[in-house]
Amino acid sequence: MPTAGGMLRTKSVEQSIRDTDEPDAKLRKDLTARDLTVFGVAVVIGAGIFTLTARTAGTMAGPSVSLAFILAAIACGLTALCYAEFASTVPVAGSAYTFAYATFGEAIAWIIGWDLILEFALAVSVVAKGWSQYLGDVLGGMAPVAHLGSVTFDWGAVTIIAIVGLLLATGTKLSSRVSAIAVAIKLGVIVLILIVGATYFKASNLTPFIPPAEPSPKADGVHQSMLAWLTGSGGTSFGWLGLLSAASIAFFAFVGFDVVATAAEETRNPQRDVPRGIFASLAIVTVCYVAVSLVLTGMVRYTQLQGENVTLATAFALHGATWVKNIIAIGALPVHRRDGDVPRPDPRALRDGPRRPDSPQPRAYR
């Protein structure tokens, strides 16, 4: 039976590093700071840049949605400082699991390890489903699903997961090269959207930058932000509370930069390259989100972006540039390179668990 002392047992940094030198558990150190930066950008920027920006601007922040992304980036930057320090000190594949094991002990590490598995598994499922929907748009509206009696089989989602699984099995170097190509396409689509959107830009659409607060039944009750509940302001949209609510939503647009830390064990110089990769990817992503937000809210009035199904393409459609929707749909396929990069941390997070001395030996790299 586990004892309290055993549950609080920690694993030293030195032991964690020694475990990575075992012949059966050693990973190739192929990655550089550039590879990690590409990895981080590929994971963080998803189709949300085409949807989240429009919905947040139309229902919460108005033109100040760009400021909301800056506030969210600052919060992520503070978190990134912790990841950068831990990853450079403990350059092991387990990421938060390993960090918790070295500081809080075995029990907390066990909980965090399963949290990571759940997080990445759910992320892969959701993103694969989104990729399948965009594939349907590219195929002319034909949904990539098959109906087997009462069961609906999404072969598009299953196919992308299978392809990415095979790609990752070939090694991280090839996967990082594919990520580089996907990121190039992704950034190319974003730059094209910024250039075309700038032709419809009107500075008057950015006024007022922070719209006055107004009642909103959709932001009342359980749907209101914690800050609105604490201050007793009730269900309101826009204003400063709307801006802060938008920042909390925008924070989730940055989720994924932390997985760069899972590649520390495969990095040539983790003490130098992992922090560089984390902050470089975060900086690039922040610039992309802020630029898209500014162009979007400069193209149309924020009141024209209110609705459940508004996207970045909505702003172009209001100007008659419906052809941009096709570019966004095609561009969203490599954007969903997240399918390839979100699964990558899962085996990396799993890898350090079997190194525990009490792990089942068939699963252990010992």
Predicted regions and their residues:
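Membrane-interface "cap" regions at the ends of multi-pass membrane proteins
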Residues: 1-54, 58-63, 77-81, 203-206, ...
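Extracellular loop-to-transmembrane helix junctions
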Residues: 28-31, 41, 49-149, 241, ...
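Hydrophobic, small-residue-rich membrane helices and short re-entrant helix-turn-helix hairpins
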Residues: 26, 170-183, 257-288, 354, ...
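Membrane-interface loop-to-helix entry segments
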Residues: 152-214, 278-282
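Selective recognition of specific alpha-helical transmembrane segments in multi-pass small-molecule
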Residues: 74-78, 186-200, 254, 275-302
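Select transmembrane alpha-helical segments in multipass membrane proteins
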Residues: 30-40, 105-118, 156-160, 234-250, ...
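Membrane-helix boundary/coupling elements in multi-pass transport proteins
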Residues: 50, 78, 92, 115-130, ...
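TM-loop-TM module centered on a large, flexible mid-protein loop between adjacent transmembrane helices
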Residues: 98-99, 105, 136-147, 214-234, ...
